[in-house]
Amino acid sequence: MDTTLDPGLGLRIRRTESLTSLIRRELERMIEVGELKAGDRLNENALAAKLGVSRGPVREACRGLEQSGLVHVIVNRGVFVREISNREAAELYDIRAALYALAGRLLASKITKKQVTELRRMVREMEEAADKGELNVFYPLNVRFHEAIVQFSGNGRLLSMCTSVHREMHLFRRRTLDMPGRMKISNAEHASIVDALEAKHGDRAARLMEDHVLKSRELLFGPLGTPAD
């Protein structure tokens, strides 16, 4: 696995952000877009060489990723992107469905025209990516769309909980979007969600958000199926 980081990464270091934090964010991005996949080994020496830094901040970044559940350390072997079991994945889907339903209900009561415009812009961009079959473009937009809904809901604790679940779900969520035609179907569901939010229909928005997540679960495991590892 090529663990090359963004060549301009070192140039974007801010005084208020440590190198360790920057490396961690970049590694999270690589996992999010599938550049680093479940089971891949993170070569600390290679990453340090790419950045022109010592192994220290790279090692610290990996420790942070371990705490967030994205990687795990195998003694005398190294750091690996964590592989999620089917049962863990199903449990995360169930949690995410409940959290998103709440986000939809909360946001519907307070959504602004500016927020609706922003969500519709993302839907249009995802539609363009789906038309071109560009999963690597669609997926980050998809992530931002869902994050925006939770953020717009205005509930800080909900945002924190969703962020934690999202991080782990990056390890397998792309699998459903890889399925033929799934990007178009998923984005049609996005458009319906925005329609419900704009109309301030809280119950409908909550139901659509929950269904949207559970449909992805069903694609992986079958209707109400018990996943087998």
Region spans (language model):
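Conserved amphipathic alpha-helical segments that form helical-bundle/coiled-coil interaction surfaces
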Residues: L92, A98, K113-R174, A188-A196, ...
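Short amphipathic alpha-helical interaction/hinge segments
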Residues: M169-R173, L177-P180, R217-L224
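Short linear motifs at protein or domain termini
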Residues: M1-S109, K114-Q115, Q151, R217-D229
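Mobile beta-alpha loop/short-helix "lid" or hinge segments that flank ligand
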Residues: E66-Q67, V71-H72, V165-R167, G181-K184
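Short helix-capping and inter-helix turn/linker motifs at the boundaries of alpha-helical repeat units
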Residues: S18, V116-T117, G181-K184
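Electropositive phosphate-/nucleotide-binding environments in soluble metabolic enzymes
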Residues: E17, S21, N187, D203
